Amino acid sequence: MEETFTEITPQQAWEMMQNEDAVLVDIRDMVRFSHSRPQGAFHLTNHSYGKFLDEYDYDEPVIVSCYHGVSSRNTAQYLVEQGFERVYSVKGGFEGWVRSELPIELGY
C-alpha cells in the first residue's frame, strides 16, 4: 500500500501546530504570502526547500496549505515521497483558514 498524506480541516491544522509542534508550510506565491498568511507559516518554494530540509526533521508533522486546498495535495504527496512521515493537507487552503477565523499574519 502506497503511503500518502491526510487531509485535515484548518481548525485541526491549527490545533496540531499548537499541540504537536507541527509546521505549516504555505505554498502560495510570494505576493500573496507576503500580504497575509497563517500565523507561523513557513513559505515553501523551490528556492526555500533546502532551508526547510535544514530546519525540519522527517518525523515532524508537516501541514501543507495553498490557496483553496487543491495544489497542496500534490505538494503533500511529494513530501511523503521524499520521506516525510506525517504529512497533511489543509482542506480549503488559506481561504478556509480565513473562513475559520484562525490567526493570520499581515504584511511583510
UniProtKB/Swiss-Prot annotation:
It holds the Pfam family Rhodanese. It is found in: Cytoplasm. The gene is glpE. Signal peptide: none annotated. One of its GO terms (biological process) is glycerol metabolic process. This is Thiosulfate sulfurtransferase GlpE. Residues 18-106 form the Rhodanese domain. Belongs to the GlpE family. CDD domains: GlpE_ST. Transferase that catalyzes the transfer of sulfur from thiosulfate to thiophilic acceptors such as cyanide or dithiols. May function in a CysM-independent thiosulfate assimilation pathway by catalyzing the conversion of thiosulfate to sulfite, which can then be used for L-cysteine biosynthesis. Keywords: Cytoplasm, Transferase. SMART domains: RHOD (SM00450). NCBIfam families: PRK00162.1. Its EC number is 2.8.1.1. InterPro entries: GlpE_sulfurtransferase, Rhodanese-like_dom, Rhodanese-like_dom_sf, Thiosulf_sulfurTrfase. HAMAP family: Thiosulf_sulfurtr. It comes from the Bacteria. It catalyses: thiosulfate + hydrogen cyanide = thiocyanate + sulfite + 2 H(+); thiosulfate + [thioredoxin]-dithiol = [thioredoxin]-disulfide + hydrogen sulfide + sulfite + 2 H(+). The keyword Glycosyltransferase does not apply. Its main location: cytoplasm. GO terms for cellular component: cytoplasm. GO terms for molecular function: thiosulfate-cyanide sulfurtransferase activity. The active site is at residue 66.
